[in-house]
């Protein structure tokens, strides 16, 4: 499976593509950062990120897009920009019929380093090691994008099995409810035919 990971941001949007093999084998296909100047109009910045994401999607043709889930921070302006970029990336994926997965920073850190509290340096070190890179991806946004892609590759099979189990459980519950309803209706019809006398 090929995953495009995105660490959304207006000034620096990290983008990384990773291929998953057997087991936990992963290979870096490409990594980069889409940059926009802070003094540019918001619409122009969003367009710049959108064009970069489109190019990555069309060049690398991933099967799924993994985006970091936006959490509220102290700087509302930063959160807004990050959320807007996330929306643009999700839209670009949807236009190509690609599924989009959102992962929290702690999910990514836990998948990559074993600890949801790992710092950026630890995540970068582990991403470099896991992917067998000659040097660490820079800046941290690039490493984070690769970490998102790896996280999705490693979590997706379990998430898929969980979703399948939940769907089966829901189907069993629906069938059980339908059988109960049918049994109650049949009992009511028998009671009506016999004048309410149960035999």
From Swiss-Prot:
Gene Ontology biological process terms in this record: DNA recombination; DNA repair
Residues that bind Mg(2+) 1: 7, 141
Entry-linked SUPFAM superfamilies: Ribonuclease H-like
Active site: 7, 68, 141
Domain of life: Bacteria
Name by which UniProt lists this protein: Crossover junction endodeoxyribonuclease RuvC
Subcellular location: Cytoplasm
EC number: 3.1.21.10
Annotated GO MF terms: crossover junction DNA endonuclease activity; DNA binding; magnesium ion binding
Entry function: The RuvA-RuvB-RuvC complex processes Holliday junction (HJ) DNA during genetic recombination and DNA repair. Endonuclease that resolves HJ intermediates. Cleaves cruciform DNA by making single-stranded nicks across the HJ at symmetrical positions within the homologous arms, yielding a 5'-phosphate and a 3'-hydroxyl group; requires a central core of homology in the junction. The consensus cleavage sequence is 5'-(A/T)TT(C/G)-3'. Cleavage occurs on the 3'-side of the TT dinucleotide at the point of strand exchange.
Cofactor annotation remark: Binds 2 Mg(2+) ion per subunit.
InterPro entries the UniProt entry points to: RNaseH-like_sf, RNaseH_sf, X-over_junc_endoDNase_Mg_BS, X-over_junc_endoDNase_RuvC
A Gene Ontology term for the protein's cellular component: Holliday junction resolvase complex
Family: Belongs to the RuvC family.
Cofactors required: Mg(2+)
Chain positions recorded as Mg(2+) 2 binding sites: 68
Disulphide linkage map: none
Record text on subunit structure and interactions: Homodimer which binds Holliday junction (HJ) DNA. The HJ becomes 2-fold symmetrical on binding to RuvC with unstacked arms; it has a different conformation from HJ DNA in complex with RuvA. In the full resolvosome a probable DNA-RuvA(4)-RuvB(12)-RuvC(2) complex forms which resolves the HJ.
């Amino acid at each position: 499976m090929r995953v495009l990971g995105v660490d959304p941001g207006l000034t620096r949007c990290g983008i990384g593509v990773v291929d998953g093999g057997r087991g936990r084998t992963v290979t870096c296909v490409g990594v980069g950062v889409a940059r926009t100047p802070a003094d540019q109009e918001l619409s122009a910045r969003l367009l710049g990120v959108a064009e970069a994401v489109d190019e990555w999607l069309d060049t690398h043709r991933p099967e799924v897009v993994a985006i970091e889930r936006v959490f509220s921070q102290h700087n509302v302006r930063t959160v807004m920009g990050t959320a807007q970029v996330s929306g643009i990336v999700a839209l670009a994926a949807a236009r190509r019929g690609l599924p989009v997965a959102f992962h929290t920073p702690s999910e990514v850190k836990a998948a990559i380093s074993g600890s949801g509290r790992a710092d950026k340096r630890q995540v970068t070190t582990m991403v470099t090691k896991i992917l067998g890179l000659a040097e660490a991806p820079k800046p941290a946004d690039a490493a984070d994008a690769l970490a998102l892609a790896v996280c999705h590759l490693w979590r997706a099979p379990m998430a898929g099995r969980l979703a399948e189990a939940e769907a089966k459980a829901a189907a069993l519950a629906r069938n059980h409810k339908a059988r109960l309803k049918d049994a109650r209706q049949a009992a009511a019809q028998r009671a009506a035919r016999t004048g309410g006398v149960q035999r």
